[in-house]
């Protein structure tokens, strides 16, 4: 590029460099999209805009991609490196330039015909300034339609800092030429496909237009389901039809979001400023699969785990910065207090009560509102656990909203609904101290403005955040496979509950929890906490801690928990240095070296972070515990032990393997333990390597408290086979509390009611007990004896003496 064009672009770039601060999606386009910079690259943009072209150029230069303003020279022919699909509108509409995109496509394809070694990568790129979807009434032109020069000037001036450059996966023109030919018809088809691609991309980034709130309410009131519920309300409460209708409108006001693009923009500015000061980084993985779903027209339902109130903001922030529409979020009604409620509502929150029982009008209004969101094409987010996890582990799923999602499918909508499980992880959760108090019996404090301000005042260095998108679950595919007859239940008017709905919803919920855990993220904090809590004195020398972290890291890298889980790429030493900056640990120095200590008052809180990744290390920890306690044991015996205990572990920690897959997984773990030198093999038997016994014992400690808890329940069941389920849960908790006091067990979830409730349900499902009691003492005693060999003698004596004391 030379002469006047260079001067023109330089002059135009002066105001753009001040006004525009764009973001690249994905963050590393060459790496994430597999672009080969040694091969020719040309860019395709939706319409003629020099502002878009220069914004693209800035991102290309920042990411070491070819400059779009520098032409491509191929076989002595100079061709522009960019193609505008559409000429774009003009200020003076009587002048319409001739479109050149088809000619350029044809020129590129023709060069491939004459040069068999040529392979140009065609990269579609869209540049967006602002993402306001507009309202369904009163706005003729949505802001993302093609803008003329004057309109573009104002868009760039006002929205230049809310802009992004979206790179799409490249298309091989060599493949196009070989498969479809190089004539002009193919060039026209290529341009048409590109137009459709950009239209879909705009919809994925902006979402459908927003309804006027009153119009939405009127439409809901006109639905047959709500009309019938209003009549029932009037009849059952002996009130007028108008009063019942007012009640329905009041419920809509309570529930419905009031989405505002300007509030999203403002919040993005505030959160960007806040995150950069509080977090040392937000790590996002597998976002491309969600962008692809949005591009393909799926109705996306985000299903994250729930760690903190911060989840609402973090996930919307991440999605917005991935070029996706922030979802409508189901938030607990407890968050609907001033000023948080109105703010959250404008950010897309719709509010849900803890229970729908006994209020048919409320459940009908909520279900119809949720169905309306789906039918209009808005993405939705809800926490399938129902509330925040107080222990750091996943809670048993609450299936009400999930059931309504499937009922929405049974209304006969055309867009496919896909559930996207999401693992959210933190190195610091601001509520963790409150969680520990609640687990010890303190009353949950009601959310309010003073509480929110106290929480905000405690925000300090929060370390790193993690958002990992798990394997999506297309609902239609799932139902086709598991309930082939599901289409017979489609009813566009009534919300029906076919016999297959409840068991299917339960299975989907359990599968989602497994997929959330599959996307787990190990980090400096949860790895260091796991190692230090494994030590009896909650302290290790720096060398011991480094060795233990190396053990965990190697285990997770060489035998990954799943293809979606993530492990830090840095060294153990770097992880320790980072964790020490979080000010959770103490360091004592002596003449020999550093001792890293987890203070007693912090130990209970740090179990939360350990529990975030307990599932990722449970199987290797259990193997290590079996080998450590037996000293010498065959592979077959290890498999037998694991197969007996696995159903309980799977239900408690939502582990991913079926029983048939255990043998292969244990073989891989055995090879890794041998590779690390933690164990040795003699014949068919595995035994401890004395020189690495401390590392193996610390690894085994990850299963210690779980095995103790199982031993408690199986001992009580063996001692009193006729005990009923409720009593078994209660006595197990009482004995667990006693054990925690006598043996210094710091984990508050050790005697958590939900953990024992889940365990007892699994024992029923596995046939150890019936609903009325009547356990088979022979079987339960066998399992107890197996567990007794895996726990220390002092703990075993405490457990066995409990029933004797009675």
Swiss-Prot record:
Which GO CC terms are listed, alphabetically? plasma membrane
Q: In which pathway does it act?
A: Phospholipid metabolism; CDP-diacylglycerol biosynthesis; CDP-diacylglycerol from sn-glycerol 3-phosphate: step 1/3
What reaction does this enzyme carry out catalytically?
sn-glycerol 3-phosphate + an acyl-CoA = a 1-acyl-sn-glycero-3-phosphate + CoA
Q: Which SMART domains match?
A: PlsC
Please report the record's description of how this protein sits within the membrane.
Answer: Peripheral membrane protein
Provide the E.C. number(s) assigned to this enzyme.
2.3.1.15
Do you know which NCBIfam families this protein is assigned to?
plsB, PRK04974.1
Name of the protein: Glycerol-3-phosphate acyltransferase
Q: Which organism is it from?
A: Enterobacter sp. (strain 638)
Organismal lineage: Bacteria, Pseudomonadati, Pseudomonadota, Gammaproteobacteria, Enterobacterales
């Amino acid at each position: 590029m030379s002469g006047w064009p260079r001067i023109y672009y330089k002059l135009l770039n002066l105001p753009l460099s001040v006004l525009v601060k764009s973001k690249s999606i994905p963050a590393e386009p060459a790496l994430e999209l597999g672009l080969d910079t040694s091969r020719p690259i040309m860019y395709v943009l939706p319409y003629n805009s020099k502002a878009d072209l220069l914004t693209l150029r800035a991102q290309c230069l920042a990411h070491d991609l070819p400059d779009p303003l520098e032409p491509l020279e191929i076989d002595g022919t100079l061709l522009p490196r960019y193609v505008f699909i559409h000429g774009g509108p003009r200020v003076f509409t009587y002048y319409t330039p001739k479109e050149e995109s088809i000619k350029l496509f044809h020129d590129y394809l023709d060069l491939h015909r004459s040069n068999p070694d040529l392979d140009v990568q065609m990269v579609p790129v869209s540049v967006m300034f602002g993402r306001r979807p507009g309202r369904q009434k009163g706005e003729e032109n949505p802001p993302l339609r093609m803008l003329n020069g004057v309109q573009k000037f104002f868009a760039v001036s006002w929205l230049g800092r809310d802009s992004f450059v979206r790179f799409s996966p490249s298309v091989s023109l060599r493949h196009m030429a070989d498969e479809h030919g190089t004539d002009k018809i193919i060039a026209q088809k290529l341009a048409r496909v590109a137009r459709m691609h950009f239209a879909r991309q705009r919809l994925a980034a902006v979402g459908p237009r927003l309804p006027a709130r009153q119009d939405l309410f009127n439409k809901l009131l006109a639905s047959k389901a709500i009309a019938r519920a209003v009549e029932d309300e009037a009849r059952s409460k002996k009130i007028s039809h108008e009063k019942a209708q007012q009640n329905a409108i009041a419920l809509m006001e309570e529930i419905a979001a009031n989405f505002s693009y300007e509030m999203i923009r403002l919040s993005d500015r505030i959160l960007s400023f806040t995150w950069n000061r509080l977090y040392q980084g937000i790590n996002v993985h597998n976002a491309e699969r969600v962008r692809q779903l949005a591009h393909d027209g799926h109705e996306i339902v985000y299903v994250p785990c729930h760690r903190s109130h911060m989840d609402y903001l973090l996930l919307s922030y991440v999605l917005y910065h991935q070029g996706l529409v922030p979802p409508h979020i189901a938030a607990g009604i407890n968050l609907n207090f001033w000023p948080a409620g109105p703010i959250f509502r404008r950010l897309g929150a719709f509010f849900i009560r803890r229970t729908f029982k006994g209020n048919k009008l409320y459940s009908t209004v909520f279900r119809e509102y949720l169905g309306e969101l789906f039918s209009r094409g808005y993405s939705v987010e809800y926490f399938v656990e129902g509330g925040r996890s107080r222990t750091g582990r996943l809670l048993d799923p609450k299936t009400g909203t999930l059931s309504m999602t499937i009922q929405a499918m049974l209304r006969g909508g055309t867009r496919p609904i896909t559930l996207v499980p999401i693992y959210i992880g933190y190195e610091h959760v601001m509520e963790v101290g409150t969680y520990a108090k609640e687990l010890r019996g303190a009353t949950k404090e009601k959310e309010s403005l003073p509480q929110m301000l106290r929480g905000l005042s405690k925000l300090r260095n929060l370390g790193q955040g993690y958002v990992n998108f798990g394997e999506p679950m297309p609902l239609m595919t799932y139902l086709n496979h598991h309930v082939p007859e599901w289409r017979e239940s489609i009813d566009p008017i009534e919300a029906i509950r076919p016999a297959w709905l409840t068991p299917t919803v339960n299975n989907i919920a359990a599968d989602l929890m497994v997929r959330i855990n599959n996307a787990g993220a190990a980090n400096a904090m949860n790895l260091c906490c796991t190692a230090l809590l494994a030590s009896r004195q909650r302290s290790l020398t720096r060398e011991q801690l480094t060795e233990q972290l190396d053990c965990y890291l190697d285990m997770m890298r060489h035998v990954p928990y799943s293809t979606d889980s993530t492990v830090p790429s840095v060294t153990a030493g770097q992880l320790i240095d980072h964790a020490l900056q979080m000010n959770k640990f103490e360091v004592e120095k002596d003449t020999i070296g550093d001792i890293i200590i987890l203070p007693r008052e912090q130990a209970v809180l740090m179990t939360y972070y350990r529990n975030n990744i307990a599932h990722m290390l449970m199987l290797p920890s259990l193997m290590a515990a079996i080998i450590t306690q037996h000293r010498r044991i065959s592979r077959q015996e290890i498999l037998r032990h694991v197969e007996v205990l696995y159903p309980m572990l799977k239900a408690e920690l939502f582990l991913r393997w079926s029983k048939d897959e255990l043998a292969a997984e244990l073989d891989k773990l055995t090879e890794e333990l041998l590779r690390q030198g933690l164990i040795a093999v003699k014949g068919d038997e595995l035994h401890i390597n004395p020189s690495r016994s401390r590392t193996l014992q610390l690894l085994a400690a990850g299963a210690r408290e779980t095995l103790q808890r199982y031993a408690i329940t199986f001992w009580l069941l063996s001692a009193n086979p006729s005990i009923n389920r409720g009593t078994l849960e209660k006595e197990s908790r009482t004995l667990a509390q006693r054990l925690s006091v006598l043996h210094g067990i710091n984990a508050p979830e050790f005697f958590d009611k939900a953990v024992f409730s889940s365990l007892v349900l699994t024992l029923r499902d596995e046939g150890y007990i019936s609903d009325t009691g009547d356990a088979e003492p022979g079987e339960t005693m066998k399992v107890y004896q197996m567990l007794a060999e895996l726990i220390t003698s002092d703990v075993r004596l405490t457990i066995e003496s409990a029933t004797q004391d009675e």
